[in-house]
A protein has these predicted regions:
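C-terminal hydrophobic structural anchor segments
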Residues: 278-316
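Extracellular loop and loop/strand-boundary signature of outer-membrane beta-barrel proteins
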Residues: 65-66, 111-117, 160-166, 203-208, ...
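Short loop/turn motifs that connect adjacent beta-strands in outer-membrane beta-barrel proteins
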Residues: 20-26, 53-60, 86-91, 138-140, ...
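Membrane-embedded beta-strand positions of outer-membrane beta-barrel proteins
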Residues: 29-33, 63-67, 92-96, 141-145, ...
Length: 354
């Protein structure tokens, strides 16, 4: 009940922030569909509500909501508003998510792509806050807060998961800080620019967290374009933890190497590199909406930093099709196929992976 009240309070607060300065608003509802190995086919809807202010017509606050249900009986509800405060040069991003998400467990530090799988169903409520203070020349400071409640309602094999951290019901409470640089020309389909983010988070018992650990992430992206229709994209991602983290919050190599399931390789730390060539070779009203991508992903999950070894990196290569819903800012439907030896995966979704 408290969780529902929290979301309701956020919604009412967001309405009150409009005040008398509201100038224009936009509202839209879109159906969604996608496919991945983790979910099978899924469908849902997403609603967008944007409203601007008289004094700052170029800035819009967001009230967005998403609901999805999958072929594997997974449910996700997400409310993610964004509020701009131009006088103080800041913005606040909130994210309240509920998930009832039947999943697969292959063990922690697994190295076998053919490892035996065990099913379990967690129910997770998470509330995140990202307060961003904009500095000069595309730099920004961030303050983060993360609150999580998780309980596993079903287990296929309770004995296997008995001693795994995060097997029981738990609360996580953490705060963090970061700095970012962003010169991208678009977030939906970037054709040029740089993005860099360094983030440090701490989950502490004095904040009410059942687990004490620290997490450091580094996300670097570069985009180089021959022209708007031919783009090379690169990403370097690093994630390290100290202390004990619930298994569901570990580094998932499959989120970055597209030939593998997300949950197949769980590790305390991880590093990944991705490269893509995205191109739209055709012209005409229909042709200009059809594009393609070639990609290469590689990375490694490891227990300790000293275990980093290029020989242990897992790789995938693949290709994809892009269909532009909007041609001005290139919001694309994405159909990707990645493969590595006997492992392969299909991913159908909206927007680019990075």
């Amino acid at each position: 009940m408290n969780k529902v009240c929290l979301v309701f309070i956020i919604f009412m607060m967001s309405l009150s922030l409009q005040g008398e300065e509201e100038k224009n608003s936009e509202f839209a509802i879109f159906p969604q569909f996608a496919y991945s190995q983790e979910t099978g086919f899924w469908g849902g809807l997403i609603t967008y509500y944007r409203y601007g202010l008289n004094k700052f017509p170029d800035l819009k606050n967001h009230l967005d909501f998403m609901a999805m249900y999958t072929e594997k009986n997974q449910l996700k509800l997400r409310f993610f508003p964004k509020f701009n405060f131009p006088i103080s040069k800041s913005e606040i991003n909130l994210d309240a998510t509920f998930m009832k998400w039947p999943s697969e467990f292959y063990g922690v530090n697994n190295t076998d792509p053919q490892a035996e799988m065990y099913e379990f169903t967690p129910e997770i409520f998470e509330f995140q806050l990202d307060w961003e203070y904009n500095l000069r020349s595309r730099w920004a400071l961030h303050f983060y807060s993360d609150q999580v409640h998780s309980v596993i309602t079903q287990r296929e094999n309770a004995a296997i998961m008995k001693n795994v951290p995060g097997n029981e019901s738990y609360l996580l409470s953490g705060i963090g800080a970061g700095i970012s640089y962003d010169s991208r020309d678009s977030e939906d389909f970037t054709s040029k620019g740089l993005y860099a983010n360094v983030k440090i988070e701490s989950y502490c018992s004095w904040l009410g967290s059942y687990y004490d650990y620290e997490k450091v992430t580094l996300d670097l992206r570069e985009f180089i374009s021959i022209n708007q229709n031919h783009v090379f994209a690169f990403q370097q991602y690093v994630s390290f933890r100290s202390g004990q983290s619930p298994f569901y919050r570990l580094f998932k190599l499959g989120e970055y190497v597209r030939a593998y399931k997300d949950e197949l390789f769980l590790n305390k730390n991880g590093i990944a590199f991705r490269a893509e060539y995205r191109f739209f070779p055709f012209k005409g009203k229909i042709g200009k909406r059809i594009g393609f991508a070639l990609f290469f992903d590689t990375g490694q999950g490891m227990q300790s930093v000293k275990d980093v070894n290029i020989a242990d990196f897992r790789c995938s290569v693949g290709a994809g099709i892009r269909i532009s819903i909007f041609t001005d800012d290139r919001f694309n439907l994405r159909f990707d196929y990645g493969r590595c030896n006997a492992n392969s995966a299909v991913d159908i979704s909206g927007g680019e992976t990075f």
